[in-house]
Amino acid sequence: GYESMNVSKDMAYKYRARYYYTNRSNNQTYYGRWSNYRYFAMPSISGKTTNKKKGIKVVLKKGTGIKQYTVSVSKNSKSGFKKVKTVKVSKKKSYSFQITKNGKKKFKKGTYYVQVTPKVKFGNKTYSSDVSTVASAYVYK
């Protein structure tokens, strides 16, 4: 069996899972072992279309329980991301900045993908999120 949870953007979550099975003949439920805790957050992100001299404008919303964001860029939506910036969270409600290079290379005309991976804090420890959010932006001449 399974149960799902409602997830809100810009919120950090800590979860664990276990399998359970209910025998219909005797109505008895059997439970498996709990997994280790996992951590994730789904940040709100937008990548704005811009020209290649200005780069890509990225806007992030501050999330509850999120301590920093790692920002990466790629020409491919699924792989090849290169880290370009780390954003530490403060008291601001949102963060806006320009990315002018893809790693060490300047942007060329085309579609780029911006990936944001949050780091979440629970107790005294900080964990990298299991989930990243990706937004696309088109760079023109």
Identify the role of each PLM range.
Residues 1-9, 70-107:
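Recognizes extended acidic, P/S/T-rich segments that occur
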Residues 2, 12, 37, 55-57, ...:
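Intrinsic-disorder/low-complexity, polar/charged segments enriched in Ser/Thr/Lys/Arg/Asp/Glu/Gln
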Residues 5-26, 102-126:
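Beta-strand-rich modules
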Residues 24-43, 123-141:
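Extracellular fibronectin type III
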Residues 24-31, 72-88, 121-128:
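Acidic Ser/Thr/Pro-rich low-complexity disordered segments
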Residues 47-52:
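Short, solvent-exposed loop/linker segments at the N-terminal edge
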Residues 54-65:
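Conserved aromatic anchor
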